[in-house]
From Swiss-Prot:
Substrate binds at residues 19-24. Catalyzes the transfer of a dimethylallyl group onto the adenine at position 37 in tRNAs that read codons beginning with uridine, leading to the formation of N6-(dimethylallyl)adenosine (i(6)A). It catalyses: adenosine(37) in tRNA + dimethylallyl diphosphate = N(6)-dimethylallyladenosine(37) in tRNA + diphosphate. Monomer. Residues 42-45, 166-170, 251-256, 284-291 are annotated as: Interaction with substrate tRNA. It comes from Burkholderia cenocepacia (strain HI2424). One of its GO terms (biological process) is tRNA modification. This is tRNA dimethylallyltransferase. Keywords: ATP-binding, Magnesium, Nucleotide-binding, Transferase, tRNA processing. Belongs to the IPP transferase family. GO terms for molecular function: ATP binding; tRNA dimethylallyltransferase activity. Its EC number is 2.5.1.75.
């Protein structure tokens, strides 16, 4: 029997919630009370030079408490759930070794699931295969590749739109590298390891009792991003010439809509409306993920004292005052 199975797992508090739910305020409130280091659970914050559209913590906020997994890769590159899992487990160990407390905070539920439930044995990205698929798509179009996917993996193809280039490419890549449909690999038992077994992850979920209030916040937040120069930020990224709208970074909510606007495909008002709608759809998916976690501790994120409630819940987790 391993040492990790003999000893009691270390409790790790996880502050999860949809966009605009107040995660940053709650995390900073905890930082004022305890020696924490924040590990971001956000697939958009990993990218450098994408500050406004991702609502990245300010320099002052990041100076007041150590943050990790922010600004770690270039927008031209990809960052997988497997990389997040490995990096997070390493960081947790390092933070604990320093005598400090890790706090996981974010809203990318796929990352959290990979961390806490393990990974499927999917092959990694292959630049040559992706280049070949990109060339095929440039010649024949993504709907043709979607039809190709339907022949080898009908289950995956059935849930993807014909122009969902990123996911179609990944599903075809997996089949070409493994010889098996992605749907079959995802249905296989997940791989776990002793590194994750050493921890007990306890989610504190910021959820709205009235989704309309959160929708209003989302609209206000998107308008504030536009006022802060979001379009200029996307324009600077476009001038690099090595980015395109099918990259994971440029598919982030808001960036895709701004790119379409700068391409002349939509007007400003339509871009704004589509950006707000896409953010609300993301929020809906995040809440659905959260509600599938029966072990979560729920805090109403639109309550007047939401930050204080979240702080109390996090401290109860860290003090061991929660059921096992």
């Amino acid at each position: 029997m391993s040492a990790s199975s003999q000893s009691r797992p270390t409790t790790i508090a996880c502050l999860l919630g949809p966009t605009a739910s107040g995660k940053t305020a709650a995390a900073l409130a905890l930082a004022a009370r305890r020696p924490i280091e924040i590990v971001s659970v956000d697939s958009a914050l990993v990218y450098r030079d994408m500050d406004i559209g991702t609502a990245k913590p300010s320099r002052e906020e990041r100076a007041s408490v150590p943050h990790h997994l922010i600004d770690i890769i270039d927008p031209a590159d990809a960052y997988s759930a497997a990389e997040f899992r490995a990096d997070t487990l390493r960081l947790i160990g390092e933070i604990v070794a320093r005598g400090r407390t890790p706090l996981l905070a974010g809203g990318t539920m796929l990352y959290y699931k990979a961390l806490t439930q393990g990974l499927n044995d999917l092959p990694g990205a292959d630049p040559e295969v992706r280049a070949a698929l990109d060339a095929d798509a440039a010649r024949d179009g993504w709907p043709a590749l979607h039809a190709r996917l339907a022949q080898v993996d009908p289950d995956t193809a059935a849930r993807l739109a014909p122009n969902d280039s990123q996911r179609i490419q990944r599903a075809l890549e997996i089949f070409m590298l493994s010889g098996q449909p992605m749907s079959a690999l995802l249905a296989a038992p997940r791989r776990t390891d002793d590194a994750a077994a050493a921890y007990r992850f306890v989610p504190v979920a910021l959820e709205p009792s009235d989704r309309a209030v959160l929708h209003t916040r989302i609209a206000q937040r998107f308008d504030a991003m536009l006022d802060a120069g979001f379009i200029d930020e996307v324009e600077r990224l476009r001038r690099r010439d090595d980015l395109h709208p099918d990259l994971p970074s440029m598919r982030c909510v808001g960036y895709r809509q701004a790119w379409e606007y700068l391409d002349g495909d939509t007007d400003y008002r339509t871009m704004r409306d589509k950006g707000i709608f896409a953010t609300r759809q993301l929020c809906k998916r995040q809440i659905t993920w959260l509600r599938a976690m029966p072990e979560r501790i729920v805090v109403d994120c639109i309550a007047p004292d939401a930050t204080a409630r979240a702080l109390d819940a996090l401290e109860r987790v860290l003090d061991g005052r929660t059921p096992d």
